[in-house]
Amino acid sequence: MKCGVFMEVYTQELPLRTSRRVELIDITSMVSGVLESSGIRNGILNVFSRHSTSAIFINENESRLLSDIESMLEGTVPVDASYGHNAIDNNADSHLRAVLLGGSQTVPVINGSMDLGTWQSIFFAELDGPRNRRIRVSVAGKP
């Protein structure tokens, strides 16, 4: 794909209300809606969590796998370990889990669609809920 000098950039914030302390939410359709609204056909799309106790990741939307991911997070970063940050607001595990998963993902946009693999979905990981959250989706490219 050739891309000229001029690109369009479209940004939209998505509100999200979570209901559990740890919750993995498939946001693929929400993000796809932003892409459609952008009118951009070829370029890149970035999904960014505006919070330090949440994350964005890409993986398969299969219930047992999602349960395994939650178990992996608990095993790797237990809630009840002795963390220095807990002296401030008792959620260090949430911050550390967010570091492991990452705060954003970028996906190629080709012919108006996200170029995700067959089994890939975009997830918002709530790691310190329930809360009201905001996700920033930015699309850059050519219409």
Swiss-Prot record:
It comes from the Archaea. Disulfide bonds: none annotated. InterPro entries: UPF0047_YjbQ-like, YjbQ-like_sf. Belongs to the UPF0047 family. This is UPF0047 protein MTH_771. The lineage of its organism: Archaea, Methanobacteriati, Methanobacteriota, Methanomada group, Methanobacteria.
